[in-house]
Swiss-Prot record:
Entry keywords, A to Z: 4Fe-4S, Chloroplast, Iron, Iron-sulfur, Membrane, Metal-binding, NAD, NADP, Plastid, Plastoquinone, Quinone, Thylakoid, Translocase, Transport
Binding site for [4Fe-4S] cluster: C43, C44, C108, C139
The species this protein was found in: Nicotiana sylvestris
PROSITE patterns linked to this entry: COMPLEX1_20K
Cofactor(s) demanded: [4Fe-4S] cluster
Gene assigned in the entry: ndhK
A single GO BP: electron transport coupled proton transport
Keyword Chloroplast carried by entry: yes
Protein name: NAD(P)H-quinone oxidoreductase subunit K, chloroplastic
GO cellular component: chloroplast thylakoid membrane; respiratory chain complex I
InterPro entries named in the record: NADH_UbQ_OxRdtase-like_20kDa, NADH_UQ_OxRdtase_20Kd_su
Compartment(s) where it occurs, according to its Swiss-Prot or TrEMBL record: Plastid, Chloroplast thylakoid membrane
Family: Belongs to the complex I 20 kDa subunit family.
Gene3D superfamilies: 3.40.50.12280
Molecular function GO terms recorded: 4 iron, 4 sulfur cluster binding; iron ion binding; NADH dehydrogenase (ubiquinone) activity; quinone binding
């Protein structure tokens, strides 16, 4: 049913009775039904949307996209993450049930990308907010690379112990890194300097003869039935 081999599988008898552990059974059920929460903000998410088509068909991996973090066990971040978006991303991750996994897709998510060079509002790596299981570099990565990342995550799930996973997540809570989010007053007050607007030349600066000559030469628009 599944091509991934379990290291803790004991033996298979002649009567087709499989002797295994509860941990392996839990891992098998989870890796065969990953429900991702799609957190896409940029062009990388368009590449992930290509997986829905018949050419790649990500339904064969049991992937069912969910719109609620409470029903998802995998969050896939794609695109630039800004300081203003960081609390929302952390909140979504916190609302996901355990065990949960993260795939960082694209250069903008992993390092901040080209937007982190001179930007003061870009998070330079989503792993400063939430723990990442699989890094998927590229700008943007191809759909084949996304499938490879999902396959690697499935292999990782098949070999892990549930207790170790929970202990690791509690010990390495990378999303608790403090960011100095200072509340600033809004600068968009609706007031603007009207003096900088473009002012057309006054008609008093144009000679009267030239003004009326130009006015008469402009024909009024005709309605066409």
């Amino acid at each position: 049913m599944n091509s991934i081999q379990f290291p803790l599988l004991d033996r298979t008898t002649q009567n087709s009775v499989i002797s295994t552990t509860l941990n392996d059974l839990s891992n098998w059920s989870r890796l065969s039904s990953l429900w991702p929460l799609l957190y896409g903000t940029s062009c990388c998410f368009i590449e992930f949307a290509s997986l829905i088509g018949s050419r790649f068909d990500f339904d064969r991996y049991g992937l069912v996209p969910r719109s609620s973090p409470r029903q998802a066990d995998l969050i896939l971040t794609a695109g630039t993450v800004t300081m203003k978006m960081a609390p929302s991303l952390v909140r979504l991750y916190e609302q996901m049930p355990e065990p949960k996994y993260v795939i960082a897709m694209g250069a903008c998510t992993i390092t901040g990308g080209m937007f982190s060079t001179d930007s003061y509002s870009t998070v330079r790596g989503v792993d400063k907010l939430i723990p990442v299981d699989v890094y998927l570099p590229g700008c943007p990565p191809k759909p084949e690379a996304v499938i490879d990342a999902i396959t690697k995550l499935r292999k990782k799930i098949s070999r892990e112990l549930y207790e170790d996973r929970i202990r690791s997540q509690r010990a390495n809570r990378c999303f608790t890194t403090n960011h100095k989010f200072h509340v600033q007053h809004s600068i968009h007050t609706g007031n603007y300097d009207q003096r900088v607007l473009y002012q057309p030349p006054s008609t008093s600066e144009i000679p009267t003869e030239i003004f009326f000559k130009y006015k008469n030469s402009v024909s009024s628009p005709e309605l066409v039935n």
